[in-house]
C-alpha cells in the first residue's frame, strides 16, 4: 500500500475509512502536511472493528522537529506516516497490542506502553514497517 500526502487545511474532514478521517493523523505541531500510509488505516480499522469501540490516535504523523520535541526515535515510523500511538476506549492496552500482533505476525511494529508508562490509560504503538519489531516500555 502507498503512503499518501494530505493537507490538514484542504483534507481535514476526508474520510479514509469508516472510522478514521485525515485530521486524526495530523502532527500536533499544527503543520499542514500529513503523511498517512494506507496500510496503517486498514490496520487501525481492523482494530476498531475487532473491539467495537472508538480508537483514539494520540500521535500519528510527526514532523522531524515535533518528533525531536517529544523524544521520538530518529528512525521513527511516525516520520513516514506509517505509525500511530493509540488508545481503545475502555480496553487494556495489552489486549490491543496482542490483537495488533495477531494481525501482523511477521512484520510491523507493536510497542506496549502499559498504564504505568506515563499516560493514565497507557497506549499502544502500531506501525506498518516491513520487518517485525516488538517492545514493551
Where do the language-model regions lie?
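Extended, low-complexity, intrinsically disordered C-terminal regulatory tails
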Residues: 41-71
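Catalytic cores and adjacent binding grooves of peptidoglycan-active enzymes
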Residues: 75, 79-84, 88-137
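Solvent-exposed, flexible loop/coil residues
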Residues: 12, 20, 65, 70, ...
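Amphipathic alpha-helical interface surfaces
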Residues: 36-43, 53, 66, 82, ...
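A short linear-motif detector with a strong N-terminal bias
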Residues: 35-37, 62-67, 88-90, 101-104
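N-terminal start-of-chain detector that recognizes signal peptides
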Residues: 28-30, 55-61, 96-99
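Extracytoplasmic cell-surface/polysaccharide-interacting catalytic and binding patches
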Residues: 1-50, 119, 130-137
Amino acid at each position: 500500500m502507498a503512503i499518501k500526502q494530505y493537507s490538514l487545511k484542504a483534507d481535514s474532514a476526508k474520510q479514509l475509512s469508516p472510522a478514521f478521517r485525515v485530521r486524526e493523523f495530523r502532527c500536533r505541531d499544527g503543520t499542514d502536511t500529513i503523511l498517512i500510509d494506507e496500510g496503517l488505516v486498514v490496520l487501525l480499522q481492523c482494530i476498531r472493528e475487532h473491539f467495537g469501540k472508538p480508537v483514539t490516535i494520540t500521535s500519528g504523523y510527526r514532523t522531524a522537529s515535533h518528533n525531536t520535541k517529544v523524544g521520538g526515535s530518529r528512525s521513527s515510523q511516525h516520520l513516514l506516516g506509517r505509525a500511530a500511538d493509540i488508545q481503545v476506549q475502555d480496553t487494556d492496552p495489552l489486549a490491543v497490542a496482542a490483537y495488533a500482533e495477531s494481525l501482523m505476525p511477521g512484520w510491523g511494529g507493536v510497542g506496549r506502553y502499559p498504564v504505568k508508562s506515563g499516560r493514565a490509560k497507557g497506549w499502544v504503538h502500531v506501525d506498518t514497517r516491513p520487518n517485525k519489531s516488538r517492545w514493551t516500555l
